Design a protein with these regions (language model features):
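Canonical Rossmann dinucleotide-binding motif of NAD(H)/NADP(H)-dependent dehydrogenases/reductases
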Residues: 51-79
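Conserved glycine-rich Rossmann-like NAD(P)H-binding loop of the short-chain dehydrogenase/reductase
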Residues: 76-91
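The beta1-alpha1 cofactor-binding region of Rossmann-like NAD(H)/NADP(H)-dependent oxidoreductases
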Residues: 87, 104-114, 146
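Substrate-binding pocket helix/loop in short-chain dehydrogenase/reductase
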Residues: 140-141, 145-153
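Active-site loop immediately N-terminal to the catalytic Tyr-X3-Lys motif
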Residues: 142, 193-199
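Active-site helix of classical SDR
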Residues: 164, 204
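Residue(s) in the substrate-gating loop at a strand-loop-helix junction
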Residues: 188
Length: 207
């Protein structure tokens, strides 16, 4: 039953995706935007547009699951911004979906904070944050250095706190409170079923 349900959901998603791409092909195409976080030169989106659409930020959105998330929210007519270290894939995803790409290494606290603060300044608020970015270094624990372990946590776990904290601080100071908000953290069953060589990854996903 579960397998059939998942298959149906996947088929429905693929159908919506195909329809959206068809509409983009023959209708008005969205234009992707690329931002360098430190420049702060992006045009501000009017406040009335902000009220009509959900404002979404995704970490690690250039490829894989992150890209699928960016595509899904773009198809749902949301305002979508995402960050990634892969410049080429990030620009391509932004072009395909009409989203906004920020080239950011999330393990760099200042870069990630600048990115989130820039988006909050331009959009006025964020309705949804999806902490998706993740890396792994599968190696025996005896061959995993403290630096390797710290790197995994600095990418997989710490950004969850950074993005959530910044949004909480921002919301606290809003003149008109936003009653809507979602913070979605992509986890993994690995934290419950750790295997040899995945100690750092398991710790980061269970954090």
């Amino acid at each position: 039953m579960a397998d059939n349900y998942i298959e149906r959901q996947q088929e429905q998603y693929e159908a919506r995706k195909a329809a959206w791409k068809q509409a983009q092909k023959y209708g008005k195409k969205k234009t992707g935007t690329t931002h360098q976080v430190r420049t702060g030169q992006a045009d501000k989106i009017p406040s009335d547009a902000n009220r009509r659409k959900r404002r979404v930020f995704v970490t690690g959105g250039a490829e894989g699951i992150g890209k699928a998330i960016v595509e899904a929210f773009s198809q749902a007519d949301c305002l979508v911004a995402f960050c990634d270290t892969n410049d080429a894939s990030g620009q391509q995803t932004a072009k395909e979906t009409g989203s906004i790409f920020h080239k950011v290494d999330v393990s760099n606290k200042e870069s990630l904070e600048n990115c989130v603060l820039q988006i909050l300044k331009e959009w006025g608020d964020l309705d949804i944050i999806i902490n998706n970015v993740g890396i792994s270094n599968f190696s025996p624990i005896t061959e995993t250095s403290i630096e390797d372990f710290d790197k995994i946590l600095s990418v997989n776990l710490r950004p969850v706190f950074i993005t959530s904290r910044l949004l909480a601080i921002h919301r606290k100071d809003l003149s008109f409170p936003n009653p809507y908000g979602r913070i979605i953290n992509i986890c993994s069953t690995r934290y419950l079923m750790s295997e040899p060589g995945s100690e750092g990854y398991a710790a980061s996903k269970g954090g």
